[in-house]
Every structure is written in structure tokens, then in C-alpha cells.
């Protein structure tokens, strides 16, 4: 029984220049699939049959640029050879990862000199990272190999198929019972009229009860206020016959007058009957003021809070106004200082040279000498700022002229 293994060997451009290295890599690949049996080039013989190894060699740059087109879902293994040891030179672009994922079969492996700092990109592409022992030349001595990462393309999981149950069809022998809608009995006209009469009677009784309750409430109010008013201001008792229906109404002015007259006796009608709002006492709250006044405050706390807020705002406005005034004054002072400095600079005495100072100097003429009197002798006798530096010594009778000497001064 024969089977085939398709292997793609991706080589770095630097590896292609060494033909012996490429042949060694190929021989190692054939040996790894030998399984300790006979090997003839690309064919491996096992106990169960022969295995044909189809090895395809490509340069990774050509595959990345799309110069060479490879079949999808074809290769069992893809081996990448990169001689660079530094991780920054082993980076694989994401587009190449996706292409390798498409070239591999399910459960196919991508191994070799892989980068170690791109695990997130590998997982996002769809690979599974596994560890595998690296093959060494010392495997003949039964030494354990170094663990390296291998990218495996997972086997796709088949989605479970859910079968829908069919509706049961009734046979001809079975009889189906259909549920009918509920039936309601229709009322006669006599019953409707009787029900309307009952409803009207109930409404009449309810109205009578409400009127009786209102009358009782009025009577209690009248008895409450008339109990104190039966004694007149003269001390005479009013009889029940003298009290009419109009006299039962109480005037507010009479109550106020009555209250003022009875203040001297230690009691008043308004103080006993009326309920005045209680002021907020700070001592009852442990000496602490309430955080905020009530929504419907009537004790005056809300007005006090508004007054405090307005006082604080006025104080802040005063402070800000003073700061603004001081800032403007400082700015005015700074501007005045700058103006004074500019005026002082303008008033400084400017150095002006006369025509004799700006005229050309001839040291060969008697009486025309420099400040040191030795400029005509040469550079050895000239000062650092002498305009004749670099010129040879002057000869008697030689005319020396300097162009633009006045501009330098």
C-alpha cells in the first residue's frame, strides 16, 4: 500500500548560495521520515507499505511576492530554513502566515526556524502552537532534543446537524376533536332594564349617604366654634332661639378683636386653635445646622441660606475686583518702565567721527601715525585691532590706502 507525503521547503535567499547546505537539509528531511527503514531518494519503505515523499524546494521571497503559485490544502509539512540567529531577522509577515495556512492540509505542520515573538499573530491566523523536539546530529547517542515551536493547522470541527421533528399526521381511523370557542348567553331586554334600575338605585343611595356625611361634617364644625361663642362679650348667655342660621357664620375680624381682648386674661382663641409653624432650632440637632432647607420651607431657613450665598458672592466679587485693579496697576507700571528705558536708550550720546578720523591714513607721511606709533614697522609691532594686520611693513614714500575703512569704524 503506497501513500504520499507532500513537503514544501522554504529557503532564505542566503541559504540558496550554499548548495552543500541545501543537500544536507534535504537528506535530514528524508532521514526523519525513514522510520528506521530503507530509503531510496524520495521513497520510504515501511512495514505497512511504501511512502512517497514529494519534496518541493522554493525561495520564500518568490512565494511571498506571488511569483510562484502553489496549490492550496496540499502540503503535509512546510519547513522554513533561516540561518539568521537574531529574532528580528526571523519575522514573518501576516500575509505570508495566511498563505502558509492555506497551503497546508488539515493537521499540517509548519516548522523550522520560526520567530518566537509573533505568537499572537500566529493564533489570530488560525494556527495552534505546539512544542516538538528539535532533531540534532547527536540523536544517535539517544540524547533528548531541544524543544521548539511548531505551528499546526487544526482539523475543522463538523457542526452538529439538528434534525427537525415532523408533525404527526392523523390517520383516517383516529378522530380529531376540535376545540370550540366559549359560548356566551345573550341577555333579554327585561333583564337589561332590571339591571339598569338596580344601578340607578345604587347611585341614588350613594348620593344620599354622601349628603348625610356632608351635613354631619358641617354640624360638627358649627358646634366646635359655637361652644365658645355662646357667651357674649357682655357676659349674657345666648339662647338657642336667638341664634339664626346666618349668625352661625363667624367673621374673621370678630375673631381678631376677640383675640386682642382676651390677651390680658392669659389665653386667646387664635393661639389655642391655630397651629403656627415651628422654627428650626439648632440646639435640637446637636448644635449643627441643617445641610439644606426643605423644599417647602416656611420657617425662614431658605431665606437665610439665600442671604448667606448672596453675601459670599458679593465678597468674592469684591476680592476679584481688587485683584483686577491691582493687576491693571502693575501692568501700567511695567509699561511706564519700558517706555522710560526706551527713552534712556534713545537719549544716549552717539559716537560721531569727523572727516579727519574717517580719512585715509598714510604712515609714510610725517605726522601721520597710529595710536601706538608703530603700525608701519610690520605685524610684529601692530596691535590686535590694527586695520593693517597682514600687510607688509611700509616703505618711506609709499602711499597706503584702505577702502571702506570708515564703514568698519
Curated annotation (Swiss-Prot):
Segments carrying the region annotation (Fe-S binding site B) are 372-386
> In which broad location class does this protein mainly occur, judging by the first location in its UniProt entry?
cytoplasm
Q: Where is the composition biased (Low complexity)?
A: 201-212
Task: Say if the entry is tagged with keyword GTP-binding.
Answer: no
Statement: the UniProt record of this protein carries the keyword tRNA processing: no
Query: Which sites bind [2Fe-2S] cluster?
Result: 280, 294, 297, 299
Q: Which UniProt keywords apply?
A: 2Fe-2S, 4Fe-4S, Cytoplasm, Iron, Iron-sulfur, Metal-binding, Mitochondrion
Q: Which InterPro entries match?
A: Anamorsin (IPR007785), CIAPIN1 (IPR046408), Dre2_N (IPR031838)
Q: Name one GO molecular function term.
A: electron transfer activity
The coiled-coil segments of this chain are none
Q: GO CC: one term? A: mitochondrial intermembrane space
Locations listed in the record? Cytoplasm; Mitochondrion intermembrane space
One Gene Ontology BP term is: iron-sulfur cluster assembly
Subunit info here reads: Monomer. Interacts with TAH18. Interacts with MIA40.
Query: What function does this protein fulfil?
Result: Component of the cytosolic iron-sulfur (Fe-S) protein assembly (CIA) machinery required for the maturation of extramitochondrial Fe-S proteins. Part of an electron transfer chain functioning in an early step of cytosolic Fe-S biogenesis, facilitating the de novo assembly of a [4Fe-4S] cluster on the scaffold complex CFD1-NBP35. Electrons are transferred to DRE2 from NADPH via the FAD- and FMN-containing protein TAH18.
> How does the entry describe the domains?
The C-terminal domain binds 2 Fe-S clusters but is otherwise mostly in an intrinsically disordered conformation. The N-terminal domain has structural similarity with S-adenosyl-L-methionine-dependent methyltransferases, but does not bind S-adenosyl-L-methionine. It is required for correct assembly of the 2 Fe-S clusters.
Return the similarity comment.
Belongs to the anamorsin family.
Q: What is the designated name of this protein? A: Fe-S cluster assembly protein DRE2
Amino acid at each position: 500500500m503506497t501513500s504520499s507525503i507532500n513537503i514544501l521547503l522554504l529557503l532564505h535567499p542566503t541559504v540558496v548560495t550554499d548548495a552543500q547546505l541545501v543537500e544536507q537539509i534535504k537528506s535530514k528531511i528524508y532521514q526523519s521520515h525513514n522510520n528506521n527503514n530503507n530509503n531510496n531518494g524520495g521513497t520510504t519503505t515501511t512495514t505497512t507499505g511504501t511512502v512517497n515523499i514529494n519534496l518541493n524546494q522554493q525561495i520564500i521571497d518568490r512565494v511571498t511576492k506571488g511569483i510562484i503559485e502553489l496549490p492550496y490544502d496540499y502540503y503535509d509539512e512546510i519547513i522554513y530554513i533561516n540561518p539568521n540567529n537574531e529574532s528580528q531577522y526571523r519575522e514573518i509577515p501576516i500575509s505570508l502566515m495566511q498563505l502558509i495556512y492555506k497551503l497546508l492540509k488539515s493537521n499540517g505542520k509548519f516548522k523550522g526556524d520560526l520567530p518566537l515573538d509573533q505568537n499572537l499573530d500566529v493564533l489570530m491566523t488560525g494556527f495552534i502552537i505546539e512544542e516538538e523536539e528539535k532533531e540534532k546530529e547527536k540523536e544517535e547517542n539517544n540524547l533528548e532534543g531541544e524543544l521548539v515551536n511548531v505551528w499546526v493547522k487544526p482539523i475543522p470541527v463538523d457542526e452538529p446537524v439538528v434534525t427537525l421533528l415532523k408533525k404527526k399526521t392523523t390517520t383516517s381511523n383516529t378522530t380529531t376533536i376540535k376545540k370550540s370557542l366559549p359560548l356566551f348567553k345573550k341577555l333579554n331586554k327585561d333583564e337589561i332594564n332590571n339591571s339598569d334600575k338596580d344601578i340607578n338605585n345604587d347611585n341614588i343611595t350613594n348620593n344620599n349617604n354622601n349628603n348625610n356625611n356632608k351635613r354631619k361634617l358641617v354640624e360638627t364644625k358649627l358646634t366646635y366654634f359655637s361652644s365658645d361663642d355662646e357667651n357674649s362679650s357682655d357676659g349674657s348667655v345666648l339662647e338657642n332661639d336667638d341664634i339664626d342660621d346666618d349668625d352661625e357664620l363667624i367673621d374673621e375680624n370678630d375673631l381678631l378683636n376677640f383675640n386682642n381682648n382676651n390677651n390680658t386674661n392669659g389665653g386667646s382663641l387664635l393661639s389655642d386653635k391655630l397651629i403656627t409653624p415651628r422654627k428650626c432650632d439648632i440646639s435640637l440637632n446637636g448644635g449643627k445646622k441643617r445641610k439644606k432647607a426643605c423644599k417647602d420651607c416656611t420657617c425662614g431657613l431658605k431665606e437665610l441660606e439665600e442671604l448667606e450665598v448672596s453675601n459670599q458672592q458679593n465678597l468674592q466679587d469684591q476680592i476679584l475686583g481688587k485683584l483686577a485693579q491691582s493687576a491693571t496697576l502693575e501692568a501700567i507700571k511695567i509699561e511706564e518702565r519700558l517706555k522710560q528705558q526706551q527713552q534712556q536708550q534713545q537719549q544716549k550720546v552717539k559716537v560721531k567721527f569727523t572727516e579727519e578720523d574717517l580719512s585715509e591714513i598714510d604712515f609714510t607721511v610725517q605726522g601721520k601715525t597710529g595710536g601706538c606709533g608703530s603700525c608701519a614697522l610690520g605685524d610684529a609691532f601692530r596691535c590686535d585691532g590694527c586695520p593693517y594686520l597682514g600687510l607688509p611693513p611700509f616703505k618711506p614714500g609709499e602711499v597706503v590706502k584702505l577702502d571702506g575703512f570708515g564703514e568698519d569704524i
